[in-house]
Amino acid sequence: MRQKDYGIIIICLAISGGMFYLAAIQQDPIRQSREKMGLVMNAALENAPPSLAFATVAMGAFRGLVVDVLWMRAEDLKEKGQFFDAKQLADWITILQPRFASVWDFHAWNMAYNISVTIPNTQCQERWRWVRNGYELLRDKGIPLNPKSIILYRQLAWIFIHKIGDVSDDCHLYYKKELALSMRSLLGDNASNGIFDELAEAPQTLDEAMADEQTAQFVAALQKADTAFSQTEKLVEQYLSLRQTPDRFAPGAFAVIDQFRESSGLKKFDTFARASQIRHLWKMDPAYMRKMNQIYGPANLKDPNQKEPLNWEHPAVHAMYWAARGLEIAGRPEQYRVDEKNTDRIIFHGLQMLYRSGKTTLYTTKDGQTSFFQRPDLRMFDSCDTIWKKIIEKYEGLEKGNPKAVRGGHKNFLEQAVMSFYQAGHVNIALRIYKDLITRYPRDESGYEYEQYKLSMVEFAKWQLKSEFSSLGNDDATEFIMMVLREGYFRYAVHDDDEAAGREKMVQEVYAMFQKEHSDESYRFGLPSMELLRYMAFMDFLNDPEYPKELRMSLLGRIQVERPDLFEKLKKQEQQYFQELQKQQQAQPANP
């Protein structure tokens, strides 16, 4: 072999060695990138289904290539609008690569958003099934397999706060109602802190629950009354079904509940059953729910240190739960990540949503259907404000003191809160918020001082009102006043008295402002008397079929008791309504 050949061989070996070295030093960065993307986990898959266990072992190194091909095909089908076909491919990808968080994200979004809207909006029940499939996929499968992937928590929270909690879907009221009914069956109406204490401390397993003698006696009696309760794995589900639909079971089954109604055994088992359903069906921890109540719960307006439980019937609370869990389990507080910031935002947007619509009213209409209505909850202000300030502080450090969007949103929130509390009659709270607003945000980003912040709180509120309604014409002002008054009557009918009073106060100020603005043009401008507008709006409310008749009758009932003088004046004009009210009262059984 010639000298030249030896030289070539040595050079090739040197190049090969260098390439091996370069490949070796890339292993750590590649591994770190895979860990950040959630593609590598140290823990082995546990309790995996046979199909998943086979696929992850049998295909070996070729799984990645197959997943790449399937993923590209799924994206192509999505772009073409073939969502059902894309769903099937996503199913396969999640089996082949269960630790690929992006495909779980895509799969859930596809079902909750794309597939659901292909169903006509007249079939809300079917749409709801696909929305539920989307969040259940993440909650029950994706997150357990990828517990360190914050994008899955964020997506799960987003489905609750946007798809269910917002108004973008034509069936959003149906989604809200179904979620509220599901949670009310487990938590009851207006659950207290004591209820959450009991749920958090309830036994974790049936064996632990049965260790109580009276609980064991109750379960034994229930199993004796109906064989449907003999299967222990379905005992909790069947018991909760018995409480909701007793006609499905033998007559003696509900008699057992009546028999044990005063015993501690029934109460303890009922608490265990509801806690078990929350843990296993909803995948939420009652102890963490209690912690959420303590951190984010609504504060008593008279005593801010006294916190009430969150409204777990509201989709925003579920969004906050999963966002908070994601930040706790998968967050990295010392690093700035867009996904983490977006998850943080879900929490304070959820709090803001609760502030604006945190109270829910479920009522049964004459045809037996359940209707749903949301209204503001001013008690959420302190929690929302506190968390918002903490998030601003967090991102001031991570973004080098420049979280503009977060600060700007907080400023707008404070301005709106001043108006809301002032209109609701909570002047002292409005003044406290206003002082914080003008101290925290005295000038804009360019250094310009806000002139309106130099006004007193009352003058600022009037300035805000004037800036919003100064351009109203005669017809616009009349329409606005009539609509707000009708809304006020609705609030009064559902016993939301603070909001009703706020609507009344706003109307009076707009009316006075408009009349003063056009006092020199009374021959051309001018509104009817306030008494006439109020009466006409009241009659419009009573005759508006969009408001359930039960609520209209409820308003009349309150007026009859609390304002008998007004009741007599209205009696002549609305005789037919009062006759129906009297019939309803006569039909009700007398109290024993």
Where are these regions (language model features)?
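Substrate-binding clefts and substrate-entry loops adjacent to catalytic sites
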Residues: 111-124
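Non-membrane alpha-helical structural segments and their capping/turn regions in soluble enzymes
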Residues: 124-135
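Aromatic-lined, polymer-binding surfaces characteristic
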Residues: 111, 127, 149-153
